[in-house]
Amino acid sequence: MISRPWQFAVGVACCVALAFPALGNGSSDASPIRETVLPNGLKVLTKELHAAPVVTVWTLYRAGSRNERPGMTGISHVLEHMLFRSTKAMKTGEIDRLVQLSGGRHNAYTSYDYTAYHITLPSERLETALRIESDRMLNCALDPDELKTELGVVLSELQGRLNDPEELLEESTRATAFLMHPYRNLIIGWKADVQSLTRESVLEYYQAHYQPNNAVLVIVGDIQTEATLDLVRQYFGGLPGGPPPPPVLTREPARMGERRVTVKGSGSTAYLQVFFDAPAAGHPDHYAFAVLDGILTNGNSSRLHKALVETDLAAALSSDYAMRKDPGWFAFYLTARAGVPHQHLEDALTQALERIRKEGVTDRELQKAINQVRADLTMEYGSVSGVARAIGKLEMTVGHQEFDRVLDRIRQVTAADIQRVARTYFGPDSRTVGWFVPEGGTTGPRLPTGGRGSAHHRPAFLADPDAGSGASPSQGGPTVAATGKVIRHVLPNGLTLIAAENRVAKSLAIKGYVLAGPVQDPPGKSGLATLTAELVTRGTATQTADELAERIEFLGATSSIRSERETVGITAQMLTEHFDVVLGHLAECLRAPAFPPDEVRKAVGQLRSRLDREAEDPKAVARRELFAHLFPPSHPLHRDPTGRREDVDSITREDVVRFHTRFYSPERTVLVVVGDRTPEEIRAAVERTFGDWPPQAVPSPPRPPMPGIASAPRRTITLPGKSEAIVMLGGNGITRDNPEYYAAFLANRILGGGELNTRLMKALRQDGGMTYGVYSYFHPVLGERPWVVSLQTGPAMVDRAIATAVAEIDRLRDRGITAEELEEARAAALGSLVLSMEDQMGMAFVLRDTELFGLGIDFPVRFPADLRSVTPAQAQAAAQKYIHPDRLVQIVVTPPQPR
């Protein structure tokens, strides 16, 4: 039974208080996976993890795009969307409401081999998740009107892909790599197929594939196994099994040689994708492939990063290899550097792969890749969601029994295995080569994750590269956090440390910042802060950029120092035994960068390339224009963090040195360390490493207030080669320390700050079918937080979408908020308090923000009471005071109107 919201809010507050010591003394030790099969064929996999009072429930169906017949592509993904709609027992929105009232979060995704639904919530609310999943397993209503609306949402999502040339290239390259097998198709489906889907076809597919004997239920977390299985039998035991679903009979014919495809379109950036044939999950070569993937592309010290990015041939690179039910692919994705001839980049990739085929890899490269897997597994398994995701993915491909064997299998891989696999699979006759050739104009690319072009990625048996299509796009990390054994300590030199013990895994997480972000850029030097942050890791007095990257990546640790709008963000994660090394690495980079001239030259060139790509990205253009119109040129938030091209071109090494000397100092630095050490041990390590860093005492000038926004004409920017419009509305907001902040926060959460059940989502997505997602938020900056609405829609629906959004804002301001809405929003926010304790990095993220925004270290304890104090009348009053639909800047980035 679902309790009343106010009762649960009190329960969450108690749960947080009780969780303080539990987290401090918790252990990552856990029971083995237990397999139970019900008489109806439902397989249930349970695993107890008692480090936090959280449970996650994953329901996986063997129904992915590989199961779709010709002409029916995308039906798995459409059905995934419909399972968030009405059932015979629940109306549309009820699933989202129940999860929110339980203080949980939920989502789903469709992959090539399966579809997964997941709900994570406080463990005392497990029954809610089971009730939802058992109901929608067989009882989805598939209402014709709801299906029509949801098809519009999916088509909007599909059209959004056309804004990205990498997506366009990938669909053509994959369709060329596979001639017959369903892996050639888009998970989201081909447009004509999606448009032709009917209720009858979706219902037939649902009844054939969604049944207990074609599903797996994975439950991981703070549970008692026997009691949990009793609940599972109660909710699922009476569901009837069905006949086996139709088997996938299509097999890809043997390849007869290399294949090529070229896609042409608007833009200024070229992209290269190379797909090699790869074996199915369970093949003896799988783990050698996984290790080779790490050697080639995992981090700045990887083979291909050094061969292609450091030589200025590629601006970015990544790879895609994962376990798949049938023979699949190993793909490389490269963004060409401006001015590089296409053949030069392709030849360089071929030569790098040929070198491994002929010479093999070194013992150090092999050990580094194994170390990375060990570290990734440790950190991934530090959350119940990570464990459940891994178990579910393995069960869908090779069997969950592999869960406890992964690391041993990886350790058994030899250098000879790596060379044999490269020789076997990376030959020229086994590849499909795709090029996107720009023809002028603009089009938006997928931006690289890291400034140096390569990013740390999860190993192939953990990653879900196929899982890009979900019912509700993720809105980022946890909102709040709590922990026991937490201290705040200011070193004599002014550096602030927040240390928290959290032993959910044998690892630690670091989040932090230096008050040296782009808001500190001097006039005429926009981009200087971003460039400086990029360069602090590119060489010190004692180590080169390659040596710095190699030292950290060999341990399997991750470390980054990246410019954000307000600050320079610090992020690191490592196994417990490597904490001191990683801390020393961060100290060396922050305190003593050498800024080698050659690295400065390369970084300036890479920042220019990033500016070029951002100028072609509709979302980046919209953000830049919005802030340029919300703040005057004299305000530090007016300028974009990446800078202007002419300013970047003028930056010299001397500018970088001066900026670093002025703004990188201990009294401007905050470190948050959470993990498998006591706060006292963490403090001692930080004092040893940073204690002798001399302070600079250079205060920042006071920031001018945000000006009042009056009604402004719509600003429309056209970008050729696009298919969808990006809309951003923005106006004045509220400061974080305002006593009315929580009332405004809850009003916004009801309007558009949650997930599927907000008023804006209901009006524009569920009822209107105008967008895949629409969100509102108070943008988290220091000082007044602008209020923003963002959405993607078809160019022809821009006026209707904006009018609908404004109408919903007016309705909230004029008619108020119901007590039920307020309690749902409050319960959802309070529930995130528990869920944020799920892993170390999430906790560190929140504790960092409590310091940045001056909330106080006791913020997690005060948060429940602060929310409970808000009444519906106060929330409405806050909306009337801080959200003004008639005083919004309107930015629209859209394709040109057809002639």
Please annotate each region the language model reported.
Residues 151, 171, 200-235, 429-431, ...:
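Non-catalytic, conformational "gating/processing" segments within enzyme and secreted inhibitor domains
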Residues 29, 37-39, 50-53, 110, ...:
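Extracellular/periplasmic catalytic domains that process cell-envelope and extracellular macromolecules
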Residues 155-161, 251-265, 371-380, 574, ...:
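Short, conserved secondary-structure transition motifs
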Residues 1-12:
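Bacterial N-terminal signal peptides that target proteins for export
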Residues 27-35, 157, 175-215, 243, ...:
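Histidine-acidic residue clusters that define the catalytic metal-binding segment
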Residues 12-45, 224-264, 306, 404-513, ...:
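Proteolytic maturation boundary segments
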Residues 47, 51-78, 92-136, 166-192, ...:
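M16 family metallopeptidases and their MPP-like homologs
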